[in-house]
């Protein structure tokens, strides 16, 4: 290869201009204003998009626009330069240049790039047109808004100009009419405010209102938001020359925080004087009031109502104190509490008194205040009938005596001829014509609670004692009840018609219990009567009337009624029915009543004769219909003013009743824990469901069943209530395999069918003693039987024999009693029992016998025991199983 240089060849050289990249980021500094005249400088950067020019150099960055102008429509793309014709090979040879021919792939790539460039150019042109249309529409909207704002500004300026003109005319007219001139203000102090207490007499020139506030005033004002806006005065007292308006509306340091805010209203009212806002005026007034009242405020003392338990938050609210202060006081006393903790009344009282408040203690039982024992005015009282309770031992003739007085026959209608309910009747005295109320009580031991209730509501107790029987246990109990109730006693010695009657013996026996009759020098009246022959009944009524006169029984009938529930039951057709003895006031139909935890409205009143009455006065027994549920016997009845008060009282009493029941259950649990583990785990329960006709009978049944319980077996009352046996009672009994007891009640059709279907036993009773005896026998069957040993005889071993197929056999002589085969035996060696078992073999000579008498010799063998020695003693005994009973 020859290295030659062709003429006309060009040499490689660098362009004269060096390629550089201009920065895309432009920096500027702007000042940002804040409230209270604060500002700071902020560096702003603007990044531009790098564009490459046609010659390969980057285009210069566009200068930042001062005002936003719509971008012009993009110019049409410049036509591509015309392609020059390719030089011929002769021309290439003459120029000395050798051009490389493009390959097919390169020509294809260039064609593709040109096509893509054309498509991209069309797309950019379309996007530019859309952007131009959007900018044009936005410009139209902006122009409309500017025109509307300009119109509003002009209208506002016109309104202000009209108001100023009207005001100026009014001032001029007033000056012309009255000839008054305003006093000139005194020269202001250094702070720009007039001196305190200064007075001026020089006339003051009219103040010219300036549309723009001078900067000097803004700089000197210490609190531009709070202090009133004043116009700066000149040295002569006249208005100072207005300062030129500021050239720029930018906020100055110390200016008000509102001057930096640009709103539409401030933009339109830029030439007006800024007035004090309502909020600023209120703040200034409050601050002045606060400075004026430097005297300490007097603490407001409140009367705080403190219940038995109260939370800290509630206590703080009632005292109008902060709960934090209350907790702080508790912490000083060494108690750590939270805001929702409950404290007792004593602690709450200490806190309230510590904070200077007065305390009024209240209790939950305050809802019962005013229900009972309200003192009546003596001028409003009138005499009332006496209430007499007949008490005594069973079968001493109490009910028969009342039947003779009432000319009725109650005894024949009673089950078993015994009284099991407490009854109330009214009898009219044949001589005086006055009414006497009698209350008949049961005499059996199971009805102790009934007798106690009868003694509490009575004025006089008639103690019936049989002349042939004398003083009995229930007679003594009746005497104790009468003394506990502090009521006088009249002794009625009954059955004097019997041949073996001994009234004197009765009087003598009563002396042992501090009951001294008049015939023996005492003050207790005694009357010998005969209920069967109706002997001396008029004398008994006369003694009762005389005793009532001595008691001087009076009450106020014109007041809300008070009374006592003697008996209560659940009647199937009438609902809850309560026998009530009215003691004070008058009970009327429609009254709202409360008795125990039950309330209601009186729907009907039924007298002892079965008649419906509208009202019942003092000492009148009536049946009351209208309770929500049957009350308990012995509850006190009261009439309240409205249902709200009745609900409060019943709610409180129901809560007390639940707490009492819970405490009893807890106490029983603690006693059971104190018992031994054997007794606790070994006790068997006898589940029962008891339904009775009246509350008093149910109470007596439950008391009797509770007394039957022991450490080994006890009656478990699943449910006890007043009324008939329902299907729900059968369902409950099925779940616990219990027995249902019905006392003077029956099961309805559905309950009887369900009991028969599920195999539940229902037992019906009319006499309480039959019920108690049956349950006692059933509970006795749950007791473990007692094992008792019966000694049969003793034998002494003389010699031991070894017999094949049998083993060791003891040759013995029976020393006492008899020895039986199969009986239990003990082997005693040196007075120590070494074996207990059964006698398996008993032979007399070579024959098997059942028993061997004393003095005879025999052979004995034990079951599974062969360690027998000569000289051992054998005890033979029999074990008997004896069934126990309660």
UniProtKB/Swiss-Prot annotation:
Bias-annotated ranges (Low complexity): 191-220
Ranges where the tr-type G domain occurs: 383-554
Region: Disordered, residue numbers: 1-261
Location of region: G4: 494-497
G2, as annotated region: 417-421
Ranges for region G1: 392-399
Record-listed GTP binding positions: 392-399, 440-444, 494-497
InterPro entries: EF-G-like_DII (IPR053905), EFTu-like_2 (IPR004161), IF2_assoc_dom_bac (IPR013575), IF2_II (IPR044145), IF2_N (IPR006847), P-loop_NTPase (IPR027417), Small_GTP-bd (IPR005225), T_Tr_GTP-bd_dom (IPR000795)
Disulphides: none
Keyword flag Protein biosynthesis: yes
UniProt entry keywords in alphabetical sequence: Cytoplasm, GTP-binding, Initiation factor, Nucleotide-binding, Protein biosynthesis
Stretches the record annotates as G3: 440-443
Localisation per UniProt entry: Cytoplasm
HAMAP family: IF_2_B
Known function: One of the essential components for the initiation of protein synthesis. Protects formylmethionyl-tRNA from spontaneous hydrolysis and promotes its binding to the 30S ribosomal subunits. Also involved in the hydrolysis of GTP during the formation of the 70S ribosomal complex.
NCBIfam families per record: IF-2, small_GTP
Official protein name in the record: Translation initiation factor IF-2
Species annotation: Rhodopseudomonas palustris (strain HaA2)
């Amino acid at each position: 290869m020859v290295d030659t240089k062709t003429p006309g060849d060009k040499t490689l050289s660098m362009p004269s201009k060096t390629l550089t990249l201009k920065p895309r980021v432009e920096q500027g500094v702007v000042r940002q204003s804040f409230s209270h005249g604060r500002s700071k400088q902020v560096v702003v950067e603007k990044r531009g998009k790098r564009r490459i020019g046609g010659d390969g150099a980057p285009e210069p960055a566009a200068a930042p626009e001062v005002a936003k102008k719509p971008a012009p429509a993009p110019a049409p793309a410049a036509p591509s330069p015309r392609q020059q014709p390719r030089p011929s090979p002769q021309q290439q040879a003459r120029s000395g240049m050798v051009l490389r021919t493009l390959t097919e792939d390169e020509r294809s790539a260039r064609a593709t790039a040109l096509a893509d460039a054309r498509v991209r150019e069309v797309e950019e042109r379309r996007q530019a047109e859309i952007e131009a249309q959007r900018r044009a529409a936005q410009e139209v909207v902006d122009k409309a808004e500017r025109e509307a704002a300009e119109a509003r500004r002009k209208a506002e300026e016109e309104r202000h100009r009209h108001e100023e003109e009207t005001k100026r005319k009014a001032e001029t007219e007033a000056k012309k009419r009255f000839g008054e001139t305003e006093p000139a203000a005194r020269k202001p102090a250094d702070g720009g405010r007039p001196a305190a207490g200064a007075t001026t007499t020089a006339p003051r020139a009219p103040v010219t209102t300036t549309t723009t506030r001078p900067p000097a005033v803004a700089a000197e004002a210490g609190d531009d938001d709070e202090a009133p806006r004043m116009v700066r005065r000149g040295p002569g007292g006249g208005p100072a020359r207005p300062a030129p308006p500021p050239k720029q509306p930018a906020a100055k340091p110390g200016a008000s925080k509102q001057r930096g805010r640009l709103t539409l209203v401030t933009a339109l009212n830029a030439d007006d004087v800024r007035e004090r806002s309502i909020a600023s005026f209120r703040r200034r007034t409050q601050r002045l009031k606060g400075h004026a009242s430097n005297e300490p405020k007097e603490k407001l003392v409140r009367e705080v109502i403190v219940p038995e338990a109260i939370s800290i938050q509630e206590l703080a609210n009632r005292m109008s104190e902060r709960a934090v202060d209350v907790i702080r006081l508790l912490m000083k006393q060494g108690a750590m509490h939270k805001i929702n903790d409950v404290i007792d009344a004593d602690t709450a009282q200490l806190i309230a008194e510590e904070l200077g408040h007065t305390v009024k203690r209240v209790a939950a039982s305050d809802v019962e205040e005013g229900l009972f024992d309200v003192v009546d005015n003596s001028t409003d009282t009138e005499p009332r009938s006496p209430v007499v309770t007949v008490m005594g031992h069973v079968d001493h003739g109490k009910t028969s005596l009342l039947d003779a007085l009432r000319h009725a026959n109650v005894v024949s209608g009673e089950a078993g001829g015994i009284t099991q309910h407490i009854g109330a009747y009214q009898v009219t005295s044949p001589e005086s014509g006055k009414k006497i109320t009698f209350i008949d009580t049961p005499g059996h031991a199971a009805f102790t609670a009934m007798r106690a209730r009868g003694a509490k509501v009575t004025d006089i107790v008639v103690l019936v004692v049989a002349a042939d029987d004398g003083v009995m246990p229930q007679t003594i109990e009746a005497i104790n009840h009468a003394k506990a109730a502090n009521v006088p006693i009249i002794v009625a010695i009954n059955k004097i018609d019997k041949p073996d009657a001994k009234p004197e013996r009765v009087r003598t026996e009563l002396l042992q219990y501090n009951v001294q009759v008049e015939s023996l020098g005492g003050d207790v009246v005694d009357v010998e009567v005969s209920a069967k022959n109706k002997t001396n009944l008029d004398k008994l009524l006369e003694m009762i009337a005389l005793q009532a006169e001595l008691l001087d029984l009076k009450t106020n009938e014109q007041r809300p009624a008070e009374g006592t529930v003697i008996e209560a039951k659940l009647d199937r057709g009438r609902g809850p029915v309560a026998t009530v003895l009215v003691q004070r006031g008058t009970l009327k139909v429609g009254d709202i009543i409360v008795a125990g935890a039950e309330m209601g409205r009186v729907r009907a009143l039924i007298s002892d004769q079965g008649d419906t009455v509208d009202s019942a006065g003092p000492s009148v027994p009536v049946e009351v219909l209208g309770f929500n549920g049957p009350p308990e016997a012995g509850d006190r009845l009261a009439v309240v003013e409205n249902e709200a008060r009745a609900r409060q009282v019943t709610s409180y009493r129901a809560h007390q009743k639940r707490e009492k029941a819970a405490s009893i259950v807890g106490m029983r649990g603690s006693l059971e824990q104190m018992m031994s583990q054997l007794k606790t785990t070994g006790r068997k329960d006898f589940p029962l469901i008891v339904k009775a006709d009246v509350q008093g009978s149910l109470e007596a049944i439950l008391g009797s069943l509770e007394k039957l319980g022991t450490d080994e077996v006890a009656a478990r009352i699943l449910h006890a209530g007043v009324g008939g046996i329902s299907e729900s009672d059968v369902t409950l009994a099925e779940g616990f395999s219990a027995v249902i007891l019905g006392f003077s009640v029956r099961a309805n059709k559905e309950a009887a069918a369900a009991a028969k279907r599920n195999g539940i036993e229902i037992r019906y009773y009319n006499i309480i003693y039959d019920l108690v005896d049956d349950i006692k026998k059933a509970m006795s069957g749950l007791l473990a039987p007692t094992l008792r040993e019966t000694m049969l005889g003793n034998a002494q071993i003389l010699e031991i024999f070894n017999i094949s197929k049998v083993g060791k056999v003891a040759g013995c002589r029976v020393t006492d009693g008899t020895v039986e085969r199969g009986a239990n035996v003990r082997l005693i060696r040196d007075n120590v029992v070494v074996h207990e078992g059964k006698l398996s073999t008993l032979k007399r000579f070579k024959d098997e016998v059942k028993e061997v008498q004393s003095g005879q010799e025999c052979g004995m063998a034990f079951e599974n025991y062969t360690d027998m020695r000569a000289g051992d003693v054998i005890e033979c005994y029999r074990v008997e199983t004896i069934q126990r009973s309660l």
